[in-house]
């Protein structure tokens, strides 16, 4: 099992969710996050003073998948989230040792 984490632009969330559903992937967590990378921040004017906004709003999607679904998920995310502009985001894949469904006690891939 693998955990796939994708950090994307917030306005791309619906497209990414639909692409994942069309690929047969269900069950994900969505977290509002802030961050910066090469995109950096921008300046804003507030009550006559200029402020540097370092952290930009992003959305983090997390899902745990069987190994054979990881490439499918990555293709769906990249296809739906790409704008070809700086700040499109990143995808991280890591190994998961164990998963347990609390309600039933199922473990492993049966739990996801």
UniProtKB/Swiss-Prot annotation:
- Show the GO cellular component annotation of the record: cytosol
Keyword annotations for this protein?
Nitrogen fixation, Nucleotide-binding, Phosphoprotein, Transcription, Transcription regulation
**O-UMP-tyrosine, modified sites:** 51
Q: Which SMART domains match?
A: P-II
Question: Which Gene Ontology terms describe the biological processes this protein takes part in?
Answer: nitrogen fixation; regulation of nitrogen utilization
PROSITE patterns cross-referenced by the UniProt entry = PII_GLNB_CTER, PII_GLNB_DOM, PII_GLNB_UMP
Respond yes or no to whether keyword Phosphoprotein is given for this record. Answer: yes
The cross-references to Pfam families, in alphabetical order and at most eight, read: P-II
Provide any one GO MF term from the record: enzyme regulator activity
Role, per record: P-II indirectly controls the transcription of the glutamine synthetase gene (glnA). P-II prevents NR-II-catalyzed conversion of NR-I to NR-I-phosphate, the transcriptional activator of glnA. When P-II is uridylylated to P-II-UMP, these events are reversed. When the ratio of Gln to 2-ketoglutarate decreases, P-II is uridylylated to P-II-UMP, which causes the deadenylation of glutamine synthetase, so activating the enzyme.
- Oligomeric form and interacting partners: Homotrimer.
**Stated name of the protein:** Nitrogen regulatory protein P-II
The source organism is: Rhodobacter capsulatus (Rhodopseudomonas capsulata)
Q: Which gene encodes it?
A: glnB
């Amino acid at each position: 099992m693998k955990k796939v984490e994708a950090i994307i632009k917030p306005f791309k969330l619906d497209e990414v969710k639909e692409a994942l559903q069309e690929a047969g992937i269900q069950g994900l967590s969505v977290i509002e996050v802030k961050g910066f990378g090469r995109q950096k921040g921008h300046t804003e004017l507030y009550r006559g003073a200029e402020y540097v906004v370092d952290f930009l709003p992003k959305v983090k999607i997390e899902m745990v998948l069987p190994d054979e679904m990881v490439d499918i998920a990555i293709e769906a995310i990249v296809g739906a989230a790409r704008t070809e502009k700086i700040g499109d985001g990143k995808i991280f894949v890591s190994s998961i040792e164990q998963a347990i469904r609390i309600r039933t006690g199922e473990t492993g891939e049966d739990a996801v």
